[in-house]
């Protein structure tokens, strides 16, 4: 008797699994609250050079700025330069003009801001940009914080993947909660930029535990029939986290208190560990029969499935252990051992890189829309709901491959069209970005489902973990691409759209999995690939 048969006896889907789904919803809410936190925490409000002896009289301030600050091409005051010598200023009181005798002839000389900056505090009371002046020449350091965070997530995923197999999912989930809480508090108390970047990278590593542990802990208690559906449904908690972050960000305008608010939910998470079950499958592979028996009994009781003592006897569980241990633990190298697996893995790598690259590129930099950051994120969060509903029907109607390729291609097209639309038409730009976000989210949701059906059972978790790592690489690079606007204003959009287009083309090289039997072994993948090679279409 294998574990799947044992799980069928105690109930592969019921109140026990639903309770588990609810208990593991909190990490899914926490992830977007930290992953998308830079939208508010690292926001750059309108700013200009700090000027000496600025008048207290508000009616004179605009005239004062005109004498000290050059204009940009759009008519706004420069954010990074000031005049070396004050320009002519009509004297409101005397009706004369005052000139600085030190002004050389010719074009007015401009210099960088040497005395710091003044910021518009109407939308944010403080951000990391305003606290450490991460603007102008230091603008890149602001983007680096997000990149370092996602690098931390990538590295943490490798560590947690190994440790959770060695010490258990439940124990490492507790470690993830505690370390996220501690490091989040340290980040909020950062006294300088270096401390902040370091603690945020470590926080990303801690949060990676949720991305690696929660899904297996959920799926290993579900029967095969309900795993895919539960996996897609659980992504709605991410959308809930996006909307919750928008609300919290609107209520809390200081980055330190906002970071604290995003971190404190770890406290009830730590308490919830008491009710989270360890994976019985993992316990059996470790020879911890009594613990596995305890959780299996609880599962059967909550699901209302009467089970005989013989089914959970030492002898019966030892047979399950024997069958589980027969299978060699897979590694990332196994994903490239055969020709068809190499094909699937390479295509999935490009797909996941493109999905993450475009999603975080759109989400983390939505400037120039003519909306407040809160309105933008509310739109972004709201549009994810119809995106998931659309995916639910499309994958059944036209299949996984065409849905994924179509959504990535549509994302690329929105970037392409936005290149042709004038930045002055805010309404059109806003509509394109929101539509692009909807397509990008749909591609993200489909990618989870599609990837899980491409890999055989023996490599499914390994394949999902590996492609997710590649995706996080795309997420870490996405914030830096914005800096390319210094080379050419349209280059970031071209990069996001180009990668999305390449990913869409790559997806078309993958086999369709709609109504196809899921592969169990590597041999199943190879046989399926040979059928496609001979006929050009899948013979499921």
Swiss-Prot record:
Keyword Transferase appears in the UniProt entry: no
One Gene Ontology MF term: prostaglandin transmembrane transporter activity
Tissues/organs with expression: Abundant expression in male and female kidney. In kidney, expressed at the brush border of the proximal tubule S3 segment (S3) in the outer stripe and medullary rays. In kidney, expression is higher in female than male. Also expressed in female liver.
Keyword Nucleotide-binding on entry: no
Membrane-spanning residues: 21-41, 144-164, 172-192, 202-222, 232-252, 257-277, 344-364, 378-398, 402-422, 429-449, 462-484, 488-510
Gene3D superfamilies for this protein: MFS general substrate transporter like domains (1.20.1250.20)
GO biological process: alpha-ketoglutarate transport; monoatomic ion transport; organic anion transport; prostaglandin transport; response to stilbenoid
Reactions that this protein is recorded to catalyse: orotate(out) + L-glutamate(in) = orotate(in) + L-glutamate(out); 3',5'-cyclic GMP(in) = 3',5'-cyclic GMP(out); GMP(in) = GMP(out); 2'-deoxyguanosine(in) = 2'-deoxyguanosine(out)
Keywords from the named record: Cell membrane, Ion transport, Membrane, Transmembrane, Transmembrane helix, Transport
Record localization: Basolateral cell membrane; Apical cell membrane; Cell membrane
Annotated GO CC locations: apical plasma membrane; basal plasma membrane; basolateral plasma membrane; plasma membrane
Membrane topology: Multi-pass membrane protein
Known function: Functions as a Na(+)-independent bidirectional multispecific transporter. Contributes to the renal and hepatic elimination of endogenous organic compounds from the systemic circulation into the urine and bile, respectively. Capable of transporting a wide range of purine and pyrimidine nucleobases, nucleosides, and nucleotides with cGMP, 2'deoxyguanosine and GMP being the preferred substrates.
PANTHER family according to UniProt: SOLUTE CARRIER FAMILY 22 MEMBER
Further comment found in the protein's record: Involved in the uptake of clinically used drugs such as bumetanide, and contributes to renal and hepatic drug elimination.
UniProt similarity note: Belongs to the major facilitator (TC 2.A.1) superfamily. Organic cation transporter (TC 2.A.1.19) family.
Protein name: Solute carrier family 22 member 7
Source organism per UniProt: Mus musculus (Mouse)
């Amino acid at each position: 008797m294998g574990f799947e048969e044992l799980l069928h006896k105690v109930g592969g889907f019921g109140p026990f699994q639903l309770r588990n789904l609810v208990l593991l919803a909190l990490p899914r809410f926490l992830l977007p609250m930290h992953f998308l936190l830079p939208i508010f925490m690292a926001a750059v409000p309108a700013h200009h050079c700090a000027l000496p002896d600025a008048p207290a009289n508000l009616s004179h301030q605009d005239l004062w700025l005109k004498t000290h600050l050059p204009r940009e091409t759009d008519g706004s005051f420069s954010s990074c330069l000031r005049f070396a010598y004050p320009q002519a200023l009509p004297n409101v009181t005397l009706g004369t003009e005052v000139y600085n005798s030190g002004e050389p002839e010719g074009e007015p000389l401009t210099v960088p801001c040497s005395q710091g900056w003044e910021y518009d505090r109407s939308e944010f009371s403080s951000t990391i940009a305003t606290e450490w002046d991460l603007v102008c020449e230091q603008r890149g350091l602001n983007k680096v914080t997000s990149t370092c965070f996602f690098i931390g997530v990538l590295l943490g995923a490798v560590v947690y993947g190994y440790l959770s197999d060695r010490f258990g999912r439940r124990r490492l989930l507790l470690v993830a909660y505690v370390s996220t809480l501690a490091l989040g508090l340290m980040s909020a108390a950062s006294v300088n930029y270096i401390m902040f970047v370091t603690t945020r990278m470590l926080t990303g590593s801690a949060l990676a535990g949720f991305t690696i542990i929660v899904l297996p802990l959920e799926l290993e208690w579900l029967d095969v029939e309900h795993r895919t559906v539960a996996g897609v449904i659980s992504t709605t908690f991410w959308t809930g986290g996006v909307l919750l972050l928008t609300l919290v960000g609107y209520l809390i305008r200081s980055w330190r208190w906002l970071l604290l608010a995003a971190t404190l939910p770890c406290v009830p998470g730590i308490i919830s560990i008491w009710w989270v079950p360890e994976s019985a499958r993992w316990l059996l592979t470790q020879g911890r029969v009594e613990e596995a028996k305890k959780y299996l009994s609880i599962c059967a009781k909550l699901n209302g499935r009467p089970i005989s003592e013989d089914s959970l006897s030492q002898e019966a569980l030892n047979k399950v252990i024997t069958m589980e241990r027969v299978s060699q633990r897979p590694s990332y190298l196994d994903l490239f051992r055969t020709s068809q697996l190499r094909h699937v893995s390479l295509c999935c790598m490009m797909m996941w890189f493109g999905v993450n690259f475009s999603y975080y590129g759109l989400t983390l930099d939505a400037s120039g829309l003519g909306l407040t950051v809160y309105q933008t994120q509310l739109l972004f969060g709201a549009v994810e709901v119809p995106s998931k509903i659309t995916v639910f029907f499309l994958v059944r109607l036209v299949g996984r491959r065409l849905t994924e390729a179509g959504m990535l291609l549509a994302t690329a097209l929105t970037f392409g069209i936005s290149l042709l639309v004038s930045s002055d038409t805010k309404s059109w730009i806003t509509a394109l970005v929101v539509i692009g976000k909807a397509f990008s989210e749909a591609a993200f949701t489909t990618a989870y489902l599609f990837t899980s059906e491409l890999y055989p059972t023996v490599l499914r978790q390994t394949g999902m973990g590996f492609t997710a790592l590649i995706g996080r690489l795309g997420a870490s690079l996405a914030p830096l691409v914005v800096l390319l606007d210094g080379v050419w204003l349209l280059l970031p959009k071209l990069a996001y759209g180009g990668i999305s287009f390449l990913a869409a083309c790559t997806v078309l090289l993958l086999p369709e999995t709609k109504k196809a039997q899921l592969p169990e072994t590597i041999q199943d993948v190879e046989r399926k690939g040979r059928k496609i090679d001979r006929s050009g279409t899948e013979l499921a």
